[in-house]
């Protein structure tokens, strides 16, 4: 069987060598590190000989190919696809308003762009909700001005449909052998360390990239009493990253970079929920 696998691998590499094609490896960042090493090392000589390979990955994992094989350092060029800029996001609202013959009042467009976390989909959600709330469903004959009177209520109502289930699953954590310690927060509620970590992340803004030190500092600011030990916080972040990859549908909402000790909020909808959603503590899995 091993010989058969080896022969298939050799045949695949031979086909790549002989054909004038570009090899594309999608979602490279999701592949287990050990498999990443095998892939890169198998392709390394062909790449040195001129084979063109594209590894598609989220921005903070763009150099995984170099991390697993240092000899690739001078052979990798990153082509970045950034989040949408504020100007690009505002254009969505401006063009939509023009098409519907409406005007968006005051500073609303600017605020929409700021709250979208670089996501055109969130920007479209804001515009859609604005129209529905003002009963605009088609192009108007007479121009109207649309506004959001209560910003907290407006953004909060949208948060319910973004990433509530992801938050609840991460706050629940893995199955525990015993009840987790409940901690008291300055906002009045109590919750375990999983809820605390999410609340600490939210307290950062949330920022979409946080170092371990930033998360721990935010924990100190929101908690009454002693902060959990460093290894406890790190363990929880690692567990959350695993849950995000294995238990949640679709793309993981967050990702912990072990080497850099940085947490990345990959999903703009999740970041948005942490800012505007109702962060309710949950009981641990067994208690």
Range-by-range predicted roles:
Residues 32-35, 85-89, 229-232:
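Phosphate/oxyanion-binding active-site loops and adjacent basic polyanion-contact surfaces
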Residues 81-109, 117, 121, 125-128:
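Conserved small helical "lid"/interfacial subdomain of P-loop NTPases
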Residues 146-287:
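C-terminal leucine-rich, beta-strand-based interaction scaffolds used for sensing/assembly
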Residues 30, 59-63, 85-89, 130-131, ...:
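Conserved nucleotide-binding/hydrolysis micro-motifs of P-loop NTPases
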Residues 3-60, 67-70:
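Conserved Walker B catalytic segment
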Residues 67-83:
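A short helix-turn-beta junction within AAA+ P-loop NTPase domains corresponding to the substrate/partner-engaging
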Residues 106-169:
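Amphipathic alpha-helical "lid/sensor" segments that cap RecA-like P-loop NTPase cores
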């Amino acid at each position: 069987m091993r010989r058969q696998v080896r022969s298939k691998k050799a045949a695949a590499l031979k086909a790549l060598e002989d054909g004038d094609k570009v090899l594309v490896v999608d979602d490279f960042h999701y592949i287990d590190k050990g498999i990443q090493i095998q892939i890169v090392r198998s392709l390394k000589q062909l790449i040195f000989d001129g084979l063109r390979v594209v590894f598609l990955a989220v921005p903070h994992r763009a150099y995984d190919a170099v991390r697993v094989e240092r000899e690739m350092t001078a052979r990798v060029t990153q082509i970045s696809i950034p989040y949408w800029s504020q100007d690009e996001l505002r254009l969505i609202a401006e063009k939509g308003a023009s098409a519907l013959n409406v005007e968006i009042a005051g500073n609303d467009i600017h605020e929409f762009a700021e709250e979208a976390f670089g996501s055109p989909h969130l920007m479209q959600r804001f515009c859609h909700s604005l129209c529905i709330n003002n009963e605009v469903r088609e192009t108007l004959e007479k121009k109207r001005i649309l506004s959001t009177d209560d910003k907290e209520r407006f953004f909060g109502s949208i948060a319910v449909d973004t990433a509530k289930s992801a938050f609840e699953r991460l706050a629940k954590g893995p199955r525990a052998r015993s009840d987790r310690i409940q901690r008291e927060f300055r906002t009045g509620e109590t919750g375990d360390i999983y809820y605390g970590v999410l609340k600490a992340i939210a307290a950062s803004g949330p920022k979409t990239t946080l170092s371990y030190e930033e998360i721990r500092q935010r924990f100190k600011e929101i908690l009454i009493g002693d902060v959990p030990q460093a290894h406890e916080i790190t363990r929880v972040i690692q567990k959350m990253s695993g849950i995000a990859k294995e238990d949640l549908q679709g793309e993981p909402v967050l990702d912990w970079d072990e080497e850099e000790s940085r947490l990345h909020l990959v999903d703009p909808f999740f970041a948005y929920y942490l800012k505007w959603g109702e962060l309710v503590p949950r009981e641990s899995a067994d208690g």
